[in-house]
Each structure stands twice: as C-alpha cells, then as structure tokens.
Amino acid sequence: MNVIPTTGLFWGILCLYVFLVLGAGLFFARNNKSTEDFFFGGRRFSWWLIGMSMLATGVGSHSFAKYAAKGFEYGFSSTMTYMNDWFFMPLLLFGWIPIIYYMKVNSIPEYFERRFNSTVRNLSTFTMLLYLIGYIGIGLLALANLLQPILGWEIQSIIIIVAIISGTYVSLGGQTAIIFTDFLQGVILLFAGLLIFGLGISYLGGFDLFWDSLSLTNKLPLADFNSPPDFNFVGIFWQDGVVGSVGFAFMNQAVIMRFLASRSVAHARRATMMNVLVFLPIGTLAVSNSGWIGRAIANAFPDVIAESTNPNGIFTIVGSLVANSEPIFAFLVASVVAALMSSLDSQINASAAVAVNDVYTPLAKNPSEKTKLRISMFTSAFVTFIGIQAAFIFSQYGTIYEAHGAFHAIVTPPMVTVIFFGIFWQRFSSRAAIMTFVLGSIFIILGEMYPYELITPFAHGTEYIADRPYSYIKALYNMVACSSIAIVVTFLSKKPIDYSKIKGLTLWTIRDGQEYFKGSKVNSNKGSEIRFSASLIEIDEKLEGKTVRLPEKYSNQLKGETGDIIYISDTRWYLGGLKSTHAILGKVSDSDKILISKEVHEHAQFDFNRKIFIELEG
C-alpha cells in the first residue's frame, strides 16, 4: 500500500501529545484513595465536565473510522446513524439515571442482583464483560486502520502498540484522569473534526464546488429504506438507533460510570441533555465530514482519491491532502489518537470495575480497599490484552462499521431487554430475566445459523446475501426474540413478586430510592447555599467519617438537618468539582469555625486561601 510521507516534526508532535496524556494518568493517580475514586472519581463532578467527557467517550476512534467511511461511500446519510438518541431520552433522564444514582449501583450486574437474583447477576456480568471487551477491540482496530496509511505497518502490530499505551494510561489514572483528559480530548476532537471540514472546503475551492461535486444521492439525509444491503435506513435504525444507541446509554458501564461520577442526579441529567442535544450533533459533523470531503474529491478528481480507496482510512487520507502544513496534519492525526484514548480509557476502566465489583469482590473475603485498588489496576491491563484478541477477530470483517453492527446485534439484545423490563415492568420476574438471557442467546445463535429461514420475515425486504446475511436487520429479530421470551415467561410465572424488595429499583418507586440514598427521610426544606473563606475551616480530628459541623448562623441559612447530605466545594467553577466532596451534616457547632473531618479534607484537598461553598443535596 502507499504510505503517506512524514518527517520527524510530525512524529515529534504526535509523541508529545501521547506523553502529555500519559503524564495526566500519573498526575491524577494521586487522587485514587479508594475504588470509588478509581472508578467514579469520588462522585463529585459538574455537569459540563461530565457532558464533554461523555462526548469524548461516544465520539471515539471507531466513530472517525466508521462514520467517515460511510460518509465516503454514501454521503450525508452517514449522519442518520448518529442522530437516534433523542427518542429514549425521557426514559433515561427520569427513569434509569435516578435509579442507578439513588440506589448507589456500582455496576449493571449489581443492579440485576438487587432487582432479581445472583444468577441474573452472573449472566449479566459475562455479557457486560463481553460487550466492553468488544468495544475495546473495535476501538483498537479503528485506530489501527486510521494509522496504517501513515505507518504502513501490519494492522496487528499497530493494535498491540496503541493497546500498550492506552492500558498503561488508564491503569495509572482511573476515572478522574479519564474525565479531565476526556474533556480536553473532547475539545480537541471537535475542533479537529471541524477544522478538516474547513480545510477540505478550501482544498476544493469553496463550498459551492464542494456541493456541486456531490451527487444527488450523496446529498440525501437518509439512505434508501431497504437497500443497499450494507447500508439501508431500516437496518441502521434497528441496529444503530435502537439496539446500539439504547445499549450504549443504558448498559454501557463506561457511560453509567459517567452518570455516577456526577455530583448529583440533576447534574447527570444536565450532562445527558447537553450531550444529546448539543454535543452529539456537532460531533456528528466532526466525525463524518472527512468522508463527505473525500467523496467530493473522488468525484471531482478521481486521480487523487480512487474509487477503490479503503474507506476505513479515509480520514487520514483526506487529512494528508487538505492540511497545508505538516504540523496541521500531525494535529489532525493526534486528534484521532485523542478520540481513541477517550473511548478506550472509559471502556478499559469500566471493564475493570465490572471485574472487581462483580467477580473479585463477591468471591474474596472482605478485601481491603488497597487490595481492590491494586486488583483494579491489574485488571485494566489484563482486559486491554483481551481487547487485542477481540480486535484481531473483528479485523476479519469487511468494514469496521459492519463489524461493530454485527457485534451490537448479537451481544446487546438480551441485556437491553432485561434492563428495560426490569425498570418499567414491576411484575417482570427473575425467572423471566434468566430465560431472556439463556433462551434469547439460543435464538440469537439459531439466527446466525439459519438467517434465511428465521430473519427473512423481519427483513423488511432487504436483500439476502449469503456471505454477509442481513448485516443489520438481525438486531430486530434478536430484540423480538428476547422481548417475546421475557413477556411470555413473566405471564407464565406463578410465584408472586415481593415488591418490598424492589423499592427504588423501578420507575414507579424512584421516591424510595431518594430515601435510600440519604439513609433517612429527604429534607425538602432546602435553604440557600453558603459561601465563606476557606480560612474559616478547621479540621477536627475527633469527627468520624465524612462529617461537617456548621455554626448556627450557617446552619440556619442552609436549613439543613443532622444527617443531611451536603456538597462542599471550592468556588472555582472551572475545576469542575475536582476540589469538592459530599459530606454528612453533623450537629450544630458551638465554634465560629466550620469543622470538617480529616476524611473530608483528604477527599476535597481544599486550598485554604480560596473561597468555599456548601449546598444542601438532600
């Protein structure tokens, strides 16, 4: 293959970026005092920081590879795969987010044990690890395809190298490193994605020439209803819009951990709305437009970009053409590395969280936090190694988009079905959940073995191709099979549900979850926040746990009661909650000082020359 020429300057800029990311991992490692810090960043971050880091997780290297590829092949209709998140937002905002946050759920499998039983937890643990490791494999494969036009190496060699870098960084830094570096990487990848669009328009000679170089089919916002077989509206809707998008938001442990890293349910909701309504539409343009530019160049100048060009690497090829200097090209490539890091770090960290919380901890006998933290770091490295093997398997598919689609369609449906019925149908039973996993998997395997016989009735007229049967519509068949099993077994179950055991775990019992979160009745008589100089803080060695005691005047202003949860933070908004923590309001202090426990100070690390605020959380 032809290799894009580069010099030492290019590699210097790229290596500098990688070392900065690794440095961030080392810097933020000092914040990891427990597994809650390593996995959830202390549950203290502001919505804008969470929202941008969620964007960086969703818009990963696989996004630049697969959506740019579809943009190159089919034009503007590539965006339809990225704009399907709006219709399930109310269910996410007012159902799933408050349930997992208030019930202090650390992982999806843990939710399943509390909602159903340990058998369902074990089944979901296996599925979740399969899902996350598959995502790691897709990310590694995507970056390898994007870098191959520059390096000219074998795909397998590139996969191994980037996996080592990513695994090292995440194993050191944990969730706090992920959130802050993902924020920076989110800004970088959006800017780079939009920059390549501007450079591409300039390369073509203006927007009018770009527009005129696209065919009418390239300009359509949606693909044809059921053709061609490798990219059609109905297949993409079921595979990407329903199974893929719903699975990503509801069962992806990496996204769940973002919600749980927020300082409150309100901040998690704001982050989600900002991400879906603002960041993702911009992200869609950023990840797809290099494909559109590539298509316009191929149509206008077929001697520059041939029709036979591998679409998986079109971002890199277009970037090398339109960048008018090597530093700019290096920056564009670095942004793809940023996208990889932003996706891989979250998936690796999430895999370790599931392995430690749902496999190691239940088997171990009261392991210490230090031991669990060490196991977490080791597991991060181990799942990265397994992700390399997954990437090798996915490389057998024709395109990254099809590999990702097939992966979603097979792995996601049982888990998504059990989550949805568990949240929204109180009668949904443990037996039905088990059968959904077991029988649902059997039907999925049968669909893979006999696609023409079983999937054709669901195919909406899409063409059957023997070597790649129903690339996307199989997601609909799998969802129907799993949902049917869930409904039938639930209605046949005779054992009554003990509703007292699922309080707070369904949409209809969210209020119970708020009381569970606090540990007592929620204080609805919220006063105004209080602000003061940190010099008024005094560390009281006698206070146990994360306790704060306020003078009477501050207590009256806050209208807090003993036992209420408060949020105490540095007032600098741009820190995003880095110097903050939740605490428990103790008895009114006789002192003029704000008394805090040693544990509160260790988590928040206040600067005593700054301003601090306290707000009542419940």
Language-model-detected regions and their locations in the chain:
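Membrane-embedded helix-loop-helix hairpins and adjacent transmembrane boundary segments
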Residues: 1-535, 553
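Short beta-strand-centered segments at strand-helix junctions
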Residues: 527-569, 578-617
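Solvent-exposed strand-loop boundary residues in beta-sheet-rich modules
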Residues: 572-574
